UniProtKB/Swiss-Prot annotation:
The gene is Nagk. Pathway: Amino-sugar metabolism; N-acetylneuraminate degradation. N-acetyl-D-glucosamine binds at residues 36, 107, 129-130, 145-147, 152. Homodimer. Its EC number is 2.7.1.59, 2.7.1.-, 2.7.1.60. Converts endogenous N-acetylglucosamine (GlcNAc), a major component of complex carbohydrates, from lysosomal degradation or nutritional sources into GlcNAc 6-phosphate. Also has N-acetylmannosamine (ManNAc) kinase activity. Involved in the N-glycolylneuraminic acid (Neu5Gc) degradation pathway. Also involved in innate immunity by promoting detection of bacterial peptidoglycan by NOD2: acts by catalyzing phosphorylation of muramyl dipeptide (MDP), a fragment of bacterial peptidoglycan, to generate 6-O-phospho-muramyl dipeptide, which acts as a direct ligand for NOD2. The modification N-acetylalanine is found at residue 2. This is N-acetyl-D-glucosamine kinase. It comes from Mus musculus (Mouse).
């Protein structure tokens, strides 16, 4: 029987499995719950992975007792070597018919492997933010990703927090706002359904919900699209912070990544990128300044991309490559370029 190759996208909320034939065709897919082993524990993680792969095998008309040739898992927390080793041991021990070979990588590595063959940057701006560089040799480095207490600069949470902070500081006469706060202040009271600043404290402390708080970013985006100067200013600063994340990893980039026809590939993940036009000015400013300060002349262009397929596809590709097989991939279908720039 022809070999099958599997890939897993392991999300904190939802997960996906894809099964591919030797010629790179997607034969079956299956969705499931979170497979973040930090959140649910190793036991439940491996059980969910096995259950999803079994369902996908059945959809593909394959006997679940026939193991895959390889299974590449793109998981959050996939850089922790001890945890990865434990996961693979558990998968082999408890589910010997699941797969012959395993590779566990980070969610960033799976994402970039879906979009490009050689690596690049994954720049995440959703509820939180993170920047990961994956070089052609598979080595990784990064900037950010430490959560809202330590940063998450340029994320939805950060944008919401900046907006609230500017309003509070302006009313307190602690720091003058760069623009009139009227629109943002009213949007803040409306979103959190409170009459004054004291009401906001409940949402900041006793009933703090990071996702709910970050959701205020959407109202700032609406204000920016309506032309509110303060809302536009906050998004411009967010773009600058995201650009600075890229600048931070420039010294670690293999020069090969600058030389492709796309220039430096930057894969953009997360809902804040829907507001690219609002981020653009600050993003370009940060990259232009950073490039000049580091004298990075080889960094002459970049392309921003979004995924059209699950990072399980990249996971499958990396898993196959790990055992010496190159799955055919059509990268032009897997990701779409939405902005290119040459310095």
């Amino acid at each position: 029987m022809a070999a099958l190759y599997g890939g897993v996208e392991g999300g904190g909320t939802r997960s996906k499995v894809l099964l591919l034939s030797e010629d790179g065709q997607i034969l079956a897919e299956a969705d499931g719950l979170s497979t973040n082993h930090w959140l649910i524990g190793t036991d439940q993680c491996v059980e969910r992975i096995n259950e999803m792969v079994d369902r996908a095998k059945q959809k593909a008309g394959v006997d679940p007792l026939v193991p895959l040739r390889s299974l590449g898992l793109s998981l959050s927390g996939g850089e922790q070597e001890d945890a990865v080793r434990l996961l693979i041991e558990e998968l082999r021990h408890r589910f010997p018919n699941l797969s012959e070979n395993y590779l566990i990588t980070t969610d960033a590595a799976g994402s970039i492997a879906t979009a490009t063959p050689d690596g690049g940057i994954v720049l995440i701006s959703g509820t939180g933010s993170n920047c990961r560089l994956i070089n052609p040799d598979g080595s990784e480095s990064g900037c950010g990703g430490w959560g809202h207490m330590m940063g998450d600069e340029g994320s939805a949470y950060w944008i919401a927090h900046q907006a609230v902070k500017i309003v509070f500081d302006s009313i307190d006469n602690l720091e003058a706002a760069p623009h009139d706060i009227g629109h943002v202040k009213q949007a803040m009271f409306d979103y959190f359904q409170v009459p004054d600043r004291l009401g906001i404290l409940t949402h900041l402390y006793r009933d703090f919900d990071k996702c709910k708080f970050a959701g205020f970013c959407q109202k700032i985006a609406e204000g920016a699209h309506q032309g509110d100067p303060l809302s536009r200013y906050i998004f411009r600063k967010a773009g600058e912070m995201l650009g600075r994340h890229v600048v931070a990893v420039l010294p670690e980039i293999d020069p090969v990544l600058f030389q492709g026809e796309l220039g430096l590939p930057i894969l953009c993940v997360g809902s804040v990128w829907k507001s690219w036009e609002l981020l653009k000015e600050g993003f370009l400013l940060a990259l232009t300044l950073g490039r000049e300060q580091q004298a990075q002349n080889s960094f002459s262009s970049f392309t921003l991309m979004k995924l059209r397929h699950s990072s399980a596809l990249g996971g499958a590709s990396l898993g196959a490559r790990h055992i010496g097989y190159h799955l055919p991939m059509d990268y032009s279908i897997n990701a779409i370029a939405f902005y290119s720039y040459t310095f």
